[in-house]
Design a protein with these regions (language model features):
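Metal-dependent amide/peptide-bond hydrolase catalytic core
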Residues: 211-388
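Non-cysteine beta-strand/loop elements that form the S-adenosyl-L-methionine
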Residues: 75-77, 86, 189, 347-352
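Active-site beta-loop-alpha junctions enriched in small/polar residues
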Residues: 26, 79-81, 137, 167, ...
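Conserved acidic residues
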Residues: 48, 158-159, 344
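Histidine/acidic-residue-rich, glycine-tolerant segments that coordinate divalent metal ions
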Residues: 59, 82-85, 89-101, 107-108, ...
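Divalent metal-coordination and catalytic microenvironments
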Residues: 21, 61, 76, 106, ...
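Acidic/His- and Gly-rich active-site-bordering loop/insert found
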Residues: 1-102, 107, 111-114, 118-126
Length: 388
């Protein structure tokens, strides 16, 4: 990889940070140790500002270039939280906390951004301001939204925002991204079906919620195939089916379904919600039952803007072995989406080699990907804000 030589020198130090984070995983907003170490290191690097407590437990660092005459302000983001998973890697530096694991590589993301921060603080070879966003609670807590709601973009005048995520299956040295939806929105629904309980021997005197809910499940799975344009990506999954009966000779009075819908655009996101409600309510009504639908919006689409993708790709081509600027979108979700709703920006995938997929107990972050991640952040800042 044509990465910057300085990161080859810094790799042992950055790797040690990463391994320390890996040994001490923290969940959601409870990232006090991690955030404290980030704050300590940013201060030691000589950042112009280091502000904790943004978005509850997020940390912001500010690095000014040799000049700030350009007025440009670019934000770089890394997530800090781990997952409630019991680690099965067998690593010497495996999690010391049973039931908690950095199974998505956020320890690597945090270490990469710290490495970039150290370099940028040393060199300051740019005309403008870099804002470092160390974010809690990506794994379901919407920490990105919390930082945006806390005014991080306005307080520091951020104009563009960039982030990365390691990607198992992509070779180390490879960077991939795309214009538009890179990762899906993720919404959840719950459908409570109420009928009329009764004896299994007298179904004519009951309204069988098991039957009604089963028909709803079948009909829900026709939404994607029969109402969504086939060139668009939408995933609908019913994940749980429960009734209030545990006996074989009882017709349940109530049944409950829970599921998720993932889309890559706002139009289909709205369409999916409308159709789920209509299918559930109308199907239940046809059987003489009722259906109450509770829709819980989750993360939006991670929607990269065209100009910023072009900048991200240009920087990537300067430091990576290979770059895919038109990678296919994938259907997991990511709360960097909230930052992209607030400002133009781009999110990239950083090759993590041949390992178990994210969220698997055997997942491993590849430390050899660190220099490229650091180099990309630095290259991006220096190209977007060239020194005079």
């Amino acid at each position: 990889m044509p990465v910057r030589n300085r990161f080859a020198e810094l790799l042992p130090e950055i790797t040690a940070w990463r391994h320390d984070f890996h040994e001490h995983p923290e969940l959601m907003y409870d990232v006090h140790r991690t955030a404290g170490l980030v704050q300590e290191r940013l201060t030691a690097f000589g950042c112009d500002e280091v502000v904790p407590g943004i978005g509850k437990t997020g940390v912001v660092g500010v690095i000014k270039g040799k000049s700030t005459a350009s007025g440009k302000v670019i934000a770089l983001r890394a997530d800090m939280d781990a997952l409630p998973i019991h680690e099965e890697t067998g690593l010497e530096y495996a999690s010391k906390t049973p039931g908690k694991m950095h199974a998505c590589g956020h320890d690597g993301h945090t270490a990469i951004l710290l490495g970039a921060a150290k370099y940028l603080s040393e060199t300051r070879n740019f005309d403008g301001t870099v804002v470092l966003l160390f974010q809690p609670a990506e794994e379901g807590g919407a920490g990105g939204k919390a930082m945006v709601d806390d005014g991080v973009m306005d307080r520091w005048g951020v104009q563009e925002v960039y982030g990365l995520h390691n990607m198992p299956g992509l070779p180390v040295g490879h960077i991939a991204t795309r214009v538009g939806g890179l990762l899906a929105s993720s919404d959840e629904f719950e459908i409570e079906v109420t009928g009329k309980g009764g004896h299994a021997a007298a179904p004519h005197d009951a309204i069988d919620t098991t039957l009604v809910a089963s028909q709803i499940v079948v009909s829900l799975h026709s939404i994607v195939s029969r109402t969504v344009n086939p060139i668009h990506r939408v995933v609908l999954t019913v994940g749980t089916f429960e009734t209030d009966s545990t006996a074989s000779n009882v017709i349940a009075h109530r049944a409950k379904l829970k599921g998720t819908v993932r889309t890559l655009d706002t139009e289909n996101r709205k369409l999916a919600e409308d159709r789920v409600r209509r299918v559930a309510e109308d199907t239940a009504s046809a059987f003489g039952a009722t259906a109450k639908v509770t829709w819980t919006p989750g993360y939006p689409v991670t929607d990269n803007t065209a100009d910023e993708v072009a900048h991200a790709v240009e920087a990537a081509r300067a430091v990576a072995d290979s770059v895919d600027p038109e990678t296919p979108p994938i259907m997991p979700s990511e709360d960097f989406a909230y930052m992209l709703e607030a400002r133009p920006g781009a999110y990239i995938f950083l090759g993590n080699g041949d390992t178990a997929m994210c969220h698997h107990p055997a997942y491993q972050f590849d430390d050899s990907a660190i220099p490229l991640g650091c180099s990309w952040f630095v290259e991006l800042c220096e190209r977007r804000m060239p020194a005079s």
